């Protein structure tokens, strides 16, 4: 599918989703004919939609239902859609999941497995030309962050910096750019001297040739973070929820898994994300303020 067509599909999806969120009705069906599947907007939306056509085809066949993939404009919009019961399935980041769970009737059921683990890391990166290769070099710089509700492009970068004696607004100026790829490009281009983003996305961007390893260096990695969870609307029928669980946990298609940089998906529960809640408290963040 051409990029122009994909952008049209993306725009239509967002308009439809926004319209639906503003329409009052008796409530969503427990076994809808069409499943709305939201993917986290951590990279360019058109790219996310394009890369996940394999997922759409897989779910269409597995459930014998129409599948609509949507990518909201930002994390807050995705949380708001979940709060209004407009998402049947949603792939959240760890922090955005915690925020959504606080205001929505959703439940996590699967998380990405890579290299035998259900965790990943956030990377602190620096512009080598600007000489930003250590924590000391970050002082006085502009530090690029992703979305305010991002785990690995906001929460854990700030936590890692704080653990190394650096505070946003005091030791460096933080700027939110919305997505991980925007952070990487800003650091590479020198618009920001350092930044924080998911290590797997950085690795992918280097592999694609988008980021030049000679221009962007990894200063540090965070402590392990629980992987992005797949969630489902709790008001779906028990039969459909069980089928959804099985469909994802049994998934072994390279075509579907490749965009997630995953070997598969494994069961996960809400308690796996208590560490995210604790990280927010350590930084003194009022997580309720992240939700509109």
UniProtKB/Swiss-Prot annotation:
Lipid-modified residues, S-diacylglycerol cysteine kind: 21
Pfam families named among the record's database cross-references: Phosphonate-bd (PF12974)
Membrane protein topology class: Lipid-anchor
Signal peptide feature range: 1-20
Swiss-Prot/TrEMBL GO biological process terms: transmembrane transport
Subcellular location: Cell membrane
InterPro entries: PhnD
Keywords: Cell membrane, Lipoprotein, Membrane, Palmitate, Signal
Gene Ontology CC terms: ATP-binding cassette (ABC) transporter complex
Lipidation residue positions, type N-palmitoyl cysteine: 21
Keyword Metal-binding: no
Source organism, top-level taxon: Bacteria
Main subcellular location: membrane
PROSITE patterns: PROKAR_LIPOPROTEIN
Protein family per UniProt: Belongs to the phosphate/phosphite/phosphonate binding protein family.
Subunit structure: The complex may be composed of two ATP-binding proteins (PhnC2), two transmembrane proteins (PhnE2) and a solute-binding protein (PhnD2).
Function field: Probably part of the ABC transporter complex PhnC2D2E2. Binds strongly to methylphosphonate (MPn), ethylphosphonate (EPn) and inorganic phosphite.
Name recorded for this polypeptide: Probable ABC transporter phosphonate/phosphite binding protein PhnD2
Species name: Prochlorococcus marinus (strain MIT 9301)
Lineage of the species this protein comes from: Bacteria, Bacillati, Cyanobacteriota, Cyanophyceae, Synechococcales
Gene this chain is encoded by: phnD2
């Amino acid at each position: 599918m051409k990029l122009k067509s994909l952008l049209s599909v993306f725009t239509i999806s967002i308009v439809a989703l926004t319209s639906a969120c503003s329409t009052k009705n008796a409530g969503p069906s427990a076994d809808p004919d069409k499943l709305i599947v939201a993917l986290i907007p951590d990279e360019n939306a058109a790219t996310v939609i394009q890369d996940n056509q394999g997922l759409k085809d897989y779910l269409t066949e597995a459930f014998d239902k129409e599948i609509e993939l949507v990518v909201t404009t930002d994390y807050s919009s995705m949380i708001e859609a979940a709060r209004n019961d407009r998402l049947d399935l949603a792939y959240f980041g760890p922090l955005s999941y915690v925020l959504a769970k606080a205001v929505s009737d959703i439940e996590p059921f699967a998380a990405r497995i890579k290299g035998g683990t259900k965790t990943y890391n956030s990377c602190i990166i620096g512009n080598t030309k600007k000489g930003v290769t250590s924590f000391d070099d970050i002082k006085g710089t502009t530090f690029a962050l992703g979305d305010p509700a991002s785990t690995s492009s906001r929460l854990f970068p700030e936590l890692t910096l704080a653990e190394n004696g650096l505070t946003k607004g005091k030791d460096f100026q933080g700027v939110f750019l919305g997505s991980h790829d925007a952070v990487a490009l800003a650091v590479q281009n020198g618009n920001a001297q350092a930044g924080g983003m998911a290590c797997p996305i950085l690795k992918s961007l280097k592999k694609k040739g988008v980021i030049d390893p000679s221009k962007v260096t990894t200063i540090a990695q965070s402590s392990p973070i629980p992987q992005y969870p797949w969630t489902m609307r709790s008001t779906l029928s028990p039969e459909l929820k069980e089928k959804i669980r099985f469909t994802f946990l049994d998934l072994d298609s390279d075509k579907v898994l490749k965009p997630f940089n995953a070997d598969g998906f494994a069961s996960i529960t809400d308690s796996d994300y208590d560490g995210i809640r604790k990280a927010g408290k350590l930084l003194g963040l009022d997580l309720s303020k992240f939700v509109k």
